[in-house]
Structures are given as structure tokens and as C-alpha cells.
């Protein structure tokens, strides 16, 4: 009986420590689940290419975040603002090949847009739904996104 209570208590502690992190839904620890994807804000600055490479190394299928709706942008702003305050984060949209073909790094289709014309990679403000083009070699904070593993 004592072993059963100890084991049950241990499982409860593990469950409570994982709840709310997305881990109970298949996300890595410290990643947040939203609409079938896992997200993580990184509070370190990298160039666009280095941030994209880093995201690929963090999670299977990971990339810089692609934003497909205003609701997803609102979710991301809700995640980034408490951590980064008034700043910008790299998103996965770029014209890295400089051929005027804007593409998401995860190869998803570009349906939703919120920008003005400037350089070749994009940041999103941490306070609202505004995208700005930036020089890809500039160092910025970033958000990674990956599908929930099946």
C-alpha cells in the first residue's frame, strides 16, 4: 500500500509539472501548444539564418514561426510580450534568395500578410500585428514553431 501511494504521488507530481507546458500534448518541455503546433520564444539574439538553423536543431520539423492568421499572431504576441516587452522577433518569412518570392521557411503557403516594403527578412513586433522587413544579418530575438509529434 505504501509503495502504491508513493508511486501515485510521484505520478501526480510529474503530471502537475507537465501540465500547462504543452508537454502533456506532445510538445517538448517549455514549449507551448496552440492549434496543433508547438511554440517557443527564445530570449537570445541571432541572425535570421542562424535562428532558422537553431529552430531546426531544437525540434523535429522546427522552423522560425510561420503566421497563418491574425489569431495566430495574437497568440504569438501573447507569448512574446511578457518575455521580451517592446521588441521584435524573427519570423520565418523571407526573400532570402532575393528573387521577390516571399516564402515561409517551413514551406507553408503564404496566405496571411501584414507588412510594408523594406529589406528581405521579417520581424514581428511583440506588441501588435505589425510585420517589418529587416536586414537578415541583423540580430533579433526569435520564436520557433514545430508540428506536434504524432
From Swiss-Prot:
GO terms for molecular function: toxin activity. Keywords: Disulfide bond, Hemostasis impairing toxin, Platelet aggregation inhibiting toxin, Secreted, Signal, Toxin. Residues 34-145 form the C-type lectin domain. Antagonist of the alpha-2 subunit of the integrin alpha-2/beta-1 (ITGA2/ITGB1) on human platelets and endothelial cells. This protein inhibits collagen-stimulated activation of human platelets in a dose-dependent manner. In addition, it antagonizes the binding of monoclonal antibodies against the alpha-2 subunit of integrin alpha-2/beta-1 to platelets and it coimmunoprecipitates with this integrin. InterPro entries: C-type_lectin-like (IPR001304), C-type_lectin-like/link_sf (IPR016186), C-type_lectin/snaclec_domain (IPR050111), C-type_lectin_CS (IPR018378), CTDL_fold (IPR016187). SMART domains: CLECT (SM00034). It is found in: Secreted. Belongs to the snaclec family. It holds the Pfam family Lectin_C. SUPFAM superfamilies: C-type lectin-like. Residues 1-23 form the signal peptide. Heterodimer; disulfide-linked. One of its GO terms (cellular component) is extracellular region. Disulfide bonds join 27-38, 55-144, 121-136. Transmembrane segments: none annotated. Expressed by the venom gland. This is Snaclec rhinocetin subunit beta.
